[in-house]
Regions:
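Acidic/histidine-rich alpha-helical segments that form the ligand environment
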Residues: 99-111, 164-200, 207-228, 260-269
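Non-catalytic, surface beta->alpha helical segment in thiol-disulfide oxidoreductase systems
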Residues: 64-87
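Alpha-helical bundle segments that constitute or directly flank the non-heme di-iron/ferroxidase center
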Residues: 91-114, 135-147, 178
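Short, contiguous alpha-helical
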Residues: 118-162, 201-262
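Short, charged, low-complexity loops and linkers
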Residues: 83-96, 164
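Local sequence-structure signature of Cys/Sec-based thiol-disulfide redox active-site neighborhoods
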Residues: 2-35
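Thioredoxin-like thiol-disulfide oxidoreductase module
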Residues: 39-57, 81
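Structural micro-motif
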Residues: 52-63, 72
Length: 269
């Protein structure tokens, strides 16, 4: 397979199916009428080879000639692609805390509805099982607390998967509930005096702690939307589904999945 040159000045987006920030990045460019070359790293092995020219092996990445921006920071993408980008408004920390708790509670509730035989089923066009998706929701919050214990957030922090003994429905539900308790304890303890304007030690660029918390909340929120979509694809109505009261005001993608057709889950079962 030939290697595509990236020295032509075209805008390229490197992404993978099911990645919340990847979907948001593509939607951002589409919304502003910016054409781009789509480079799905799960489908084209040469895509990662192109990223290696920049010393990168992560997504989402937007490149233009010999410069690049991490798609998780839209203001950097806007600068790279000559898109006007004004000030953004974030929800208060106290509200984000409530939203994250609702997301974790929802994840536990939806996991309780998942048939045991379906946990090992894979998401369409993504090597991630339904069980791993549920675990990932809780692990996003866990990565936030790791950061607060002095462990920097890396790309691999979000690529972890549970060991087999932690992949059962009961264990996954317990993990979500554990993270609700731990997050509440943190907010009632160290979180009370946290400087939310301080810089977060994250791999994707300059972010304040407030921005990192927002990323944590909407990231987990997008994946819980995917889990509800999974249930619908299995013919199961989500128990007390999360809606606008949980997601409004968060910078989430509009779509749930790159091709959000739950019937595809039924056809692939």
């Amino acid at each position: 397979m030939g290697t595509t040159t990236t020295a032509d000045g075209a805008i390229r987006v490197y992404w993978m199916t099911g990645c919340s920030s990847c979907l948001r990045t593509k939607e951002f460019l589409q919304k502003h009428g910016v054409p781009f070359l789509s480079r799905n790293v799960l489908e084209d092995e040469s895509a990662y080879a192109e990223l290696e020219q920049f010393g990168l092996k992560q997504v989402p990445i937007v490149t233009r000639g010999d410069t690049w921006a991490n798609g998780q920071i839209l203001r950097d993408v806007a600068k790279l692609c000559d898109i006007p980008y004004g000030a953004t408004k974030m929800l208060p920390v106290a509200e984000m805390r409530l939203r994250l708790d609702a997301v974790l509670a929802g994840a536990a509730r939806f996991l309780a509805q998942m048939p045991d035989h379906a946990l090992a089923q894979m998401l369409p066009n993504r090597p991630r099982s339904f069980a791993q998706l549920g675990w990932h929701i809780a692990n996003i919050a866990d990565a936030f607390l790791e950061h607060e214990d002095g462990i920097p957030l890396t790309f691999d922090s979000y690529m972890r998967v549970p060991v087999e003994e932690d992949s059962g429905r009961a264990q996954l539900i317990a993990y979500c509930e554990e993270m609700r308790v731990r997050m509440s304890a943190w907010f009632e303890g160290p979180g009370r005096t946290r400087d939310w304007s301080a810089r977060a030690d994250v791999y994707y660029g300059e972010q304040t702690m407030h921005e990192f918390l927002e990323r944590t909340v909407w990231h987990a929120g997008q994946h819980v939307r995917q889990f509800m979509w999974v249930l619908e694809g299995l013919g199961i109505a989500p128990d007390r589904p999360l809606g606008r009261e949980t997601f409004d005001g968060l910078p989430m993608p509009e779509k749930v999945w790159d091709e959000a057709d739950p019937a595809k889950l039924r056809r692939s079962a």
